[in-house]
């Protein structure tokens, strides 16, 4: 029987977790309140540690040792067979813990040798033996925190690993709490188990969405903050459907491009240059009513319509609202809206982008500039909270070759320090990972 520990913010929660894992087969030995420091002492958290053992089968707990459970029962009558009673007590204690078993084994052997000697005596002798055993158990229990601190190095290691990958504080905090809640103490001792569990949660945080199959005209609209690369990304998408895809299918789709970006210097010129290279028409609209006119016209003569929008800061609520007017003008059309975000953005900034651009009812994300970031933790942290799927990822400036279908493995390739990463990336998540439709 092993000495185990459960950690929780309160004693009640710790006991609840113990009961959930082990049922009624537990024996609580000791409770300790601790102040633990995180992030190099900047944050302190109060926790309660409960040390306990688990009874299996017919094994007894410390509370089942004769005269510990009820001393009055022992003191009610004289003991006729002292050594037999000692053996019973010692064997009960032996099943609590391996360390205790090691210390009481010589006492059991000595008692068995004297078992034939029956000397009537008072219960005080048995009571003294019980007190000795209780002291032994308490001493071993008191030494447990040193062992536990070493065993919980796995928690400290995974916390540091997540920090090095730029995961947000909230993601790290939730992951550590979830580890302690869902894994047994035995599993927490193994860093390999801890790492594989956290890696699985990271994978589960990434949701992939396959582009829809449409029978009519597809109206693909890109929205997003300034500087994330919407115009270049839209050119890559247009080139994929107009140049790359026909080589595979043998079918040449009809493609049109519209831009509403009249404010950024050179934006329309940049898109016009891309269209000239691909032999596509570009329409620059100045107002929502003009946008409606061209969208209506293109529904009859085009297979795919791409719409580039002006980039605005997520805190520029006034101009974002003005952009919404364009969308209201075409509210009767089925729009395929994608929010374009920079892979290197901070988690807090991404949360704000998700919040402000929710007005556009985007269906999925396009993650840009994956090649320009060294850490992916901020992105995954934000994705785990928003649960917004990804459809495309860009990995460079080349049109159209640096546009890729979103995949779990592509994002995992940016993680650093996970020894089990190669094994996970060897799993077949398909072209789109965990698909959502």
UniProtKB/Swiss-Prot annotation:
Database matches in Gene3D superfamilies: Flagellar FlhF biosynthesis protein, N domain, P-loop containing nucleotide triphosphate hydrolases
Bilayer topology term: Peripheral membrane protein
InterPro entries according to UniProt: AAA+_ATPase, FlhF, FlhF__GTPase_dom, P-loop_NTPase, SRP54_GTPase_dom
Molecular function via GO: ATP hydrolysis activity; GTP binding; GTPase activity; signal recognition particle binding
Signal peptide location: none
CDD domains reported in the protein's UniProt record: FlhF
Positions of GTP binding: 224-231, 308-312, 368-371
Biological process according to GO: bacterial-type flagellum organization; protein transport; SRP-dependent cotranslational protein targeting to membrane
Taxonomic superkingdom: Bacteria
GO cellular component terms attached to this protein's record: plasma membrane
Family per record: Belongs to the GTP-binding SRP family.
Protein name as catalogued: Flagellar biosynthesis protein FlhF
Gene: flhF
